[in-house]
Each structure stands twice: as C-alpha cells, then as structure tokens.
Amino acid sequence: MRIEQTTRFNKHLARLPVSVQEQCAKQIALLADNPRHPSLHFKKLADRDDTYSIRIASNYRAIFMMAHDTCIFFAIGHRKDVYR
C-alpha cells in the first residue's frame, strides 16, 4: 500500500507534539504493512465516501482517503477538532 501526505497534513503534523509526530509515523507504517491491525482503530467515516480515520494516540486521529492502493492523508489533529 502506498502512502501520500498532503502539504496541509504535513503542516498540521509539524504543529503537534514530537511524541505525537513519532507515534504518527509508527501508525502510518503499520497501516501500510497491516491495515487491519487492531491498534489502528481503522474506521470509515459515515458521511464521506472513501474517507477513513486511524487512531494516532489516545486523543489524536489522522484522516485519509483511499484511492486504489494509495492512502492520501489530508488531516490530523485532536479528535474533537479533526472531524470538522
């Protein structure tokens, strides 16, 4: 599975604590290797086609779109803000 990150995603990621940035790298690598791993808490977003979320840390989520075999990450943030 290929992984891509938008410029917006990278800007938001850079603003997060270093520990969250490191966990994000681990979770994205895990997604590329095993999308069904239970620690990802992989979920389809109900109101959007081909849009999913994974848990980065207890309160952080990364949002991405699936296009064939590519995950395009476009949002990351605290769970209370990222779904807006």
Task: Spell out what each predicted region is.
Residues 2-7, 11, 19-22, 55-61, ...:
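Enriched for short, Lys/Arg-rich terminal
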Residues 1, 38-43, 80-81:
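Flexible, active-site-adjacent loop/turn segments at secondary-structure boundaries
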Residues 4-8, 14, 27, 45-47, ...:
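Basic nucleic-acid-binding interfaces
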